[in-house]
Amino acid sequence: MARKKAVKVEADPRLNAVNEALKFIKDGMIVGLGSGTTANLFIAELGKKISEEGLNVFGVPTSFESRMMAIQYGIPLVSLDEYGELDIAVDGADEVNKETLNVIKGGGGCHTQEKIIDYCAKELIIIVDESKLVDSLGENTPVPLEVLPFAYSSVLNELLKMNSAPSIRMADKKMGPVITDNGNMIIDVFIDLNNPEEVEKQLNNIPGVVENGIFTKVDKVIVGKSDKAEILKK
């Protein structure tokens, strides 16, 4: 009888990033809880540390999904109304410039809440796997803009004047555009990001734009690899 070959199960590199990020979470901290698949892994593992090790922290969620995840895993929640400054925020990213550590976020449409909470933190940690690292920001990923619905046409016109390539993000499971947790639309735009700090400001200066997905205030990026995690700092 032929012997079956053992199937090797590859570890998720993101879990190595998550476990490294958890080392920075201490008792008594107020923690910003990011959104997205990698951030969800962090929320799940943080919940385990609370239930199994008695870690005493409070979370501030950045989206409906992260709130539901935190409740599911028993993370006590507070709001920015109670704490205007957080000790730390841990979030994922769609693209990370491996030299500058500037990132693009917002593939899930939550970047407005994410930026508010992430930028309120004393320390912002981004957790990713190696596939999210790029040499030049915006290589493969457009910058998302959350836009007031009645202003989408004027915002598109302003973006075209900036030699960019904008498009309204359309929904997969319903007719019409994607609608954010805040009731707004999303415009995705490919634009020159040689100076992301300046573009971040320029995009937000367009009337009707609520927030954009360029994040330039990252303190650490933790890159999960198959056998370890690497910490990148500015």
UniProtKB/Swiss-Prot annotation:
Protein name stated in the entry: Ribose-5-phosphate isomerase A
Role of this protein: Catalyzes the reversible conversion of ribose-5-phosphate to ribulose 5-phosphate.
Superkingdom, natural source: Archaea
Residues at the catalytic site: E114 (proton acceptor)
Any GO molecular function: ribose-5-phosphate isomerase activity
Documented EC number(s): 5.3.1.6
Gene Ontology, cellular component aspect: cytosol
Subunit architecture: Homodimer.
Gene: rpiA
